[in-house]
C-alpha cells in the first residue's frame, strides 16, 4: 500500500470517528467527543463508588448528611426543571443520585462521579461554613457530571 492511500484511510477513519463520536454538551451546546458510552462509564463509576464507601470512614453526622441530601435533592429538581422548561433532553435522567459524607478533616474536597455519585469530605465543611457555601461546592461538582466532562475526558484518553 502506498503512503498516499494509507494516509487517506487514516483520514477517513479519523473523520468517521469525529463525526460519530461528537455530541453536544448540555446547556452550552459546545461540541464534545464521546466515544465511550455513558452507560459504561456510569456502571464503572457505581462500582468505584461502592469501593470508596467500603474503604473510607463514613461520617456519623446524620444531621449534616441529611442537609447534604436535601441540598442535592433541590439541585436535582432544579436541573430537571431547567431542562424541562428549555425543551432540552435532561442528561441526568439515567442518574442514580447518591450522597455520602466521608469523615476526613484533612481532605478539603468534594467530587461527583458520572451517574450522580457524590462525596463530600468533612474537611471542606470548615471552608464552606454554611449550607450556601456547601451548595456552591456541590453545584460545581454536579455541573461536571451534568456536562458529561468525565465521558469527554475518558473519550479523549482513548485517542
Specify the residue positions occupied by each region the protein language model found.
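A Zn2+-metalloprotease active-site environment signal
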Residues: 2-159
